Amino acid sequence: MGLDTYIFSVENPKDGKETPDVIHSAKFTYSPIKEEAYWRKNYFINSYIGELYEKKRKEDLTEFNFNTVYVKVTYDDIKKLKRKINTLPHASWEANSLDPKKYPTIRLLRGVLREIKDNAGKRTFYAMSNW
């Protein structure tokens, strides 16, 4: 099981406010919360997210289903993590074969934080895909 994170904003052309929008997918569930993201907590997440999870756990802990716990993080948290990921070597078969317990952030390289815009250009998604 992999890690999924998502961050996006939705603009309503009528009143300029955010509108609830849930897209059903096998891999993703999107939140209407602007410039925030949810990280699924599992043992592949590196120590940075682990510490963030413990620090924010009391106020931000949210359960989305029976066995998966997410923690809410800000866009700045995601940018800091992306900088950490960018300093690592590029993903390769060799990198992916490294022991995830010794090199946990290598696992994150298979899903690079990216920007996706819909056809109308009104919605922006920042998503790290499952592996």
Identify the residue ranges that each predicted region occupies.
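Acidic (Asp/Glu-rich) sequence patches and key acidic residues
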Residues: 1-123, 129-131
